[in-house]
Amino acid sequence: MFGIRSGNNNGGFTNLTSQAPQTTQMFQSQSQLQPQPQPQPQQQQQHLQFNGSSDASSLRFGNSLSNTVNANNYSSNIGNNSINNNNIKNGTNNISQHGQGNNPSWVNNPKKRFTPHTVIRRKTTKQNSSSDINQNDDSSSMNATMRNFSKQNQDSKHNERNKSAANNDINSLLSNFNDIPPSVTLQDWQREDEFGSIPSLTTQFVTDKYTAKKTNRSAYDSKNTPNVFDKDSYVRIANIEQNHLDNNYNTAETNNKVHETSSKSSSLSAIIVFGYPESISNELIEHFSHFGHIMEDFQVLRLGRGINPNTFRIFHNHDTGCDENDSTVNKSITLKGRNNESNNKKYPIFTGESWVKLTYNSPSSALRALQENGTIFRGSLIGCIPYSKNAVEQLAGCKIDNVDDIGEFNVSMYQNSSTSSTSNTPSPPNVIITDGTLLREDDNTPAGHAGNPTNISSPIVANSPNKRLDVIDGKLPFMQNAGPNSNIPNLLRNLESKMRQQEAKYRNNEPAGFTHKLSNWLFGWNDL
């Protein structure tokens, strides 16, 4: 505020104005808490006496110190006066506020406060200025405590929510890692309620027969539907379907027994092939498979049917997918190239040394295979006869059960049926069908009768397994133009008769010389 300059010491304390505000601020802050008493004039006198009793060497320093102390005391007095003035002003202001509206000071000075959760009743009684200050302090402290309390409540609730959310997250994670299926499914509820008449799309993997039977029922029964979560449902449905199949089979067997026996005897036909070496048995079976479908499961035929022997499996014979009387649907799961019910059955294989039984699915295939009787295959003469139970028992040396007696058929019935269709067809001129002996011309037989086709060939069909095919010498085509009344000389007949006479004479009058015998032995003329 102002400076004091000393005449004796100009360099010690030149300016005190810079220190005055600091002292005033310090005194002001202290005066707000507690007012200080004013210094007594006796203290000043003591300082003066102390200064007067000092020696001459320290006189200058004492004068300067006393001057500074006096200046500080004076400034403190000024600060105390200003504090008193402020207190008086505050008191008058508080009195004026109480006189105007009887409201506390915090109403005129609103602040952003946090609204507590509970309503607090505030007292508005008339008090003095000191009580107002205490009330303000108490209200501020109360508001602070309420804010802290509400904040703690919010923090606790937030923590509880976070803990519950964390627990829910943990539970959800634990439930996701749980692989155990639910104990009750929608299928179980539907089984309990038994409502609805249309099954869901997920249950359409039931067999075709079973789904076809469900259309005849009025309501949908979920007990007969496979359940993914119920292993016993498949066994139960299999038993139901098996019982249904058995009932249908018994009914069909009693009603169609005659029809089944006739169809069985007319569909399967078996033959016996013999006379071949064992080294060409696979080639022989493959050769006879070209005439028709062989029912026996030979390994050599699997690759030809598109079946790998390493992964070959025989499927069950019972039908769980289709109705037995329904011929438009597959009877069961079949392999490639097997589309009927008879192919699923395991047929017995009868074979031995240089003989084998082959069963065809049609009589026409068996008749075609019988034509291979007496032919040469891979350098071996083979025979082919129709199947009979007695023949196989003699070849195999064992007794055949009636269940395994499959493939016996009546050849004459098919021969008579095929004779009517082939009777109008002329036989080849160089083929003669005989009953076991070669048909030869007699010398007394006229040439005209020999050229007549009706006298040469019989009306028996050419593919009969009981007949033998023989080839004649080939002179018949040249003799067909000679009639019974023809005067044309038969040169061929005369030449042939002369050659035969000369040959007979030569054999009867053959010379017995050593040279002739040696030449015949060397050149082989004796074999001619």
Swiss-Prot record:
Residues recorded with modification Phosphoserine: S458, S464
Post-translational modification summary for this protein: Phosphorylated by CDC28.
Gene3D superfamilies cross-referenced by the UniProt entry: 3.30.70.330
Cellular-component GO terms for this entry: nuclear envelope; nuclear membrane; nuclear pore; nuclear pore central transport channel; nuclear pore nuclear basket
Chain segments carrying region Disordered: 23-64, 88-144
Chain intervals with Polar residues compositional bias: 51-64, 97-108
Subcellular location as annotated: Nucleus, Nuclear pore complex; Nucleus membrane
Start and end residues of each RRM Nup35-type domain: 265-394
Per-repeat ranges for FG: 2-3, 61-62, 195-196, 274-275, 291-292, 523-524
Entry GO MF terms: phospholipid binding; single-stranded DNA binding; structural constituent of nuclear pore
Sequence ranges of Basic residues compositional bias: 110-125
Coiled coil: 490-510
InterPro entries documented for this protein: Nucleotide-bd_a/b_plait_sf (IPR012677), RBD_domain_sf (IPR035979), RRM_NUP35_dom (IPR007846)
Compositionally biased tracts (Low complexity): 23-50, 127-141
Keyword Cell membrane included in the entry's annotation: no
Function field: Functions as a component of the nuclear pore complex (NPC). NPC components, collectively referred to as nucleoporins (NUPs), can play the role of both NPC structural components and of docking or interaction partners for transiently associated nuclear transport factors. Active directional transport is assured by both, a Phe-Gly (FG) repeat affinity gradient for these transport factors across the NPC and a transport cofactor concentration gradient across the nuclear envelope (GSP1 and GSP2 GTPases associated predominantly with GTP in the nucleus, with GDP in the cytoplasm).
Name of the protein this chain belongs to: Nucleoporin ASM4
Organism: Saccharomyces cerevisiae (strain ATCC 204508 / S288c) (Baker's yeast)
Name of the coding gene: ASM4
